[in-house]
Amino acid sequence: MTDRYPSPRALLDRYDLRAKKSWGQNFLGEEAVLDDIARLAAPRAGDPVLELGAGLGHLTARLLARGARVVAVERDRDMARVLRGELGDRITLLEADAARLDHAALAARFGAPAAAGEGARLAVVGNLPYHLTSPILFSILDQVAHVSRAVFLLQREVAERLAAPPASRDWGLLSVLLQREAEVSVERIVPPGAFWPPPKVESAVLCALFRPPADAVGDPARFRRLVKAGFGLRRKTLRNALGSAKLAEPARLEAAFAAAGVDPGRRGETLTLAEWAALDRALG
């Protein structure tokens, strides 16, 4: 790290702490990766950024150096103590669960309008433990109108699944839901040695730039149920998978397949985003 901010090991020693394995704590200390994440999350000075799981504050410090206005979320009281001690009132610190945030309220308080007539939004950034990735992503997707972009450090295999192309082996529920709302890309691979303590797997930086959905659906909540059902029984055909989920009467399902131009003998992972959206509209 730089002279301005101590290394992860130095901070843990200073505060007599250890990384908590049960919390998935692996602290990123590689300068180049921190700089890339901060640049992606806060391209302009003054940008409001919500950092999920701020930890020891290494990314927080980089965001501040870029002139970002940082709202740091940290549930671990030990980490919150470090953040207060090292960064003080330069940040707004919230001791809260990152998967249970009210993004509308946070955006209204700290966010910036995306364009004339649009509501306030925040960029969201964080180094997400594996076990919290899905809950946090679903929380963001439920409140996507209040998020401008998301930049996450994830396990490499998770990041690659989220950015997977349609009809590929890694194409799944979260791939469909996230890519409907955002342009998604894997920006760089991060080796275990960039962290302390080093994890056993590679990580990757994922960037999601939120924009109006490219494919309209009849009912967003039903769309999620539809896609979940289609991927829930991957070995079954769409006719059987959606029929088992009882999303509609069999005759209505058959009519929807015909109207959407989707062969009910296909499997869910073979459908593109546009085909999923067309099937949802046909069910409406």
Swiss-Prot record:
One of its GO terms (molecular function) is 16S rRNA (adenine(1518)-N(6)/adenine(1519)-N(6))-dimethyltransferase activity. This is Ribosomal RNA small subunit methyltransferase A. PANTHER family: DIMETHYLADENOSINE TRANSFERASE, DIMETHYLADENOSINE TRANSFERASE-RELATED. PROSITE patterns: RRNA_A_DIMETH (PS01131), SAM_RNA_A_N6_MT (PS51689). GO terms for cellular component: cytosol. It comes from the Bacteria. SMART domains: rADc. Specifically dimethylates two adjacent adenosines (A1518 and A1519) in the loop of a conserved hairpin near the 3'-end of 16S rRNA in the 30S particle. May play a critical role in biogenesis of 30S subunits. Belongs to the class I-like SAM-binding methyltransferase superfamily. rRNA adenine N(6)-methyltransferase family. RsmA subfamily. It catalyses: adenosine(1518)/adenosine(1519) in 16S rRNA + 4 S-adenosyl-L-methionine = N(6)-dimethyladenosine(1518)/N(6)-dimethyladenosine(1519) in 16S rRNA + 4 S-adenosyl-L-homocysteine + 4 H(+). It is an enzyme of class 2 (transferase). It holds the Pfam family RrnaAD. Its EC number is 2.1.1.182. S-adenosyl-L-methionine binds at residues 26, 28, 53, 74, 97, 127. Its main location: cytoplasm.
